[in-house]
Amino acid sequence: AYEMLRSLVGSEMCIREELEEADEDLSVSLFGTLIDSLTAAGYEHYEISNFCLPGFHSRHNSSYWTEKKYLGCGPSAHSYNGTSRQWNVASLNEYIRGISNGNPTFEVEELDLYTRYNDFVITHIRTQWGMPLPKLRKQYGEELYKYCLRMATPHLQQGTLEIKNDTLKLTRKGVFISDGIMSDMLWVE
């Protein structure tokens, strides 16, 4: 499910062959055991890599998964207003200088319809709530709605996706290959 970043201590140990990276089958088995153990203990598996006791979902991450607008303050902080993403300069000194001069340094990415659709797919399909198909159709139009269903069809047939109550969701089997499923469903020109 995850790859080690070169900057992590464990990855350096793998490079020096002091620590072996678990093979994929073992990783899948361990993640399955984690899901089973935590859900048996009363935790909700509400997002691919998030578990919580009922009612204790991450408020911060839930903003991403529910398309809520958010404001990020400070160096490297990100904001989202529904049509664009914005992020502040990473350097603390540069950030303070910009604020002091009344001219904060940040970058903006305007999000076109297809980018917003891709964000919708990535953020919704990862959660236990899935992707509400009527909302997809209303927000992104008939073309992207049909595209999404066409791209989802092989996964529906393989049992890695399901549609329940007009909502497209990963099955347990799909959770283990979610990156591939999401990438199949993204709009690529």
Report the location of each language-model feature.
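Short amphipathic alpha-helical interaction segments
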Residues: E142-L156
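Short, amphipathic alpha-helical interaction segments positioned at domain boundaries
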Residues: K173-E189
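Single conserved hydrophobic/aromatic residue that forms the stacking wall/gate
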Residues: A1-I15
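Minor-groove-contacting beta-hairpin "wing" of winged helix-turn-helix DNA-binding domains
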Residues: T167-T171
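A short, conserved structural fragment
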Residues: L156-D166
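C-terminal scaffold of the Radical SAM
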Residues: S11-E142
